[in-house]
Design a protein with these regions (language model features):
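N-terminal Sec-pathway targeting helices
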Residues: 1-19, 23-26
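Membrane-interface motif at the C-terminal end of an N-terminal transmembrane signal
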Residues: 21-38
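Boundary/entry segment of secreted carbohydrate-active catalytic domains
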Residues: 33-90, 94
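Hydrophobic faces of well-ordered beta-strands that scaffold small-molecule active sites
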Residues: 57-61, 89-93, 127-131, 169-173, ...
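Aromatic-lined substrate-binding rim segments of carbohydrate-active enzymes
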Residues: 75-134, 147-150, 202-208
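The substrate-binding groove and active-site-proximal loops of carbohydrate-active enzymes
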Residues: 97-108, 137-148, 177-189
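Active-site groove signature of glycoside hydrolases
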Residues: 128-138, 157-190
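Catalytic-core regions of glycoside hydrolase
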Residues: 170-181, 185-239
Length: 239
């Protein structure tokens, strides 16, 4: 009995040593494999006071354009106005549609707007874009009397906004309010803001984000599911 127990212990030790040996060989093979696959480079960093041109952040200048019938060389005008703006990665574009508050955008207006977007797409910045009807804090004098005119403008602009989506950082506001800031507007009720948001979502690429002024406005717009099929898209793209 004693010899049998001793033999059993000896066999256990032998099996354990064999297992450890096999694991050791396997581990060595794995180490060699990963050493072969992974390459590392030693890098030494030093402190610097240089400003980094991180994208989509920081201070920005505002560039406003009032759309009219006359053709404009926006590339030349923008280049002149931006010649001192060399250290930023963002800019704001305000597009005033006041001349067309009574009806649809003309073909000349659309051509001017497209030329303006073509000009900003040639810059080294991404753009916060805001459409508006008022620059004077007197929105009720200049805002369209019928919401269908505003949604009509959004529809007309859809092709341009989708074509130049890559230069748009965000679309700010819903075209309404003093300075386009969504205050002092007759369209502040939930139904109107949802209607405007739904149309602007439809008129823009799915990668374009929209922004409203306050959390209360965001909750008012997204708080119900009255707009069939749009509520999920709305909450994903609206900030």
């Amino acid at each position: 009995g004693a010899m049998r127990r001793a033999a059993g212990k000896f066999l256990t030790v032998v099996m354990l040593l064999a297992t450890l040996g096999a694991l050791g060989l396997l581990g060595r093979e794995l180490v060699q494999h990963f050493q072969w696959c992974i390459q590392a480079e030693t890098v030494r960093f030093t402190e610097s006071a240089d400003e980094l041109r991180n994208p989509d952040r920081g201070v920005y200048a505002i560039y406003g354009f009032r759309i009219k019938e006359e053709p404009v060389d926006y590339a030349a005008e923008l280049a002149e106005r931006m010649k001192e703006d060399t250290d930023t990665t963002l800019a704001m574009l305000q597009i005033n549609l006041q001349e067309y508050r009574g009806g649809e955008l003309s073909s000349a207006a659309l051509e001017n707007i497209e030329n303006l977007f073509r000009a900003i797409s040639g810059t080294d910045k991404r753009w916060i874009v805001r459409f508006l009807y008022d620059w004077y804090g007197e929105n009720e004098q200049y805002e369209p009397q019928d919401i269908e005119i505003i949604t009509g403008h959004m529809k007309q602009l859809g092709g341009i906004l989708k074509t130049y989506k890559d230069c748009i950082f965000t679309l700010q506001g819903l075209f309404i309010g003093n300075w386009g800031e969504m205050n002092g507007t007759r369209y502040a009720d939930q139904e109107s803001m949802q209607q405007l948001t739904a149309q602007l979502l439809e008129s823009t690429d799915e990668t374009t984000f929209l922004a409203v002024r306050t959390p209360a406005q965001w909750r008012k717009i997204t708080g119900t599911a009255d707009i069939a099929g749009a509520d999920g898209e709305m909450t994903r793209r609206l900030g």
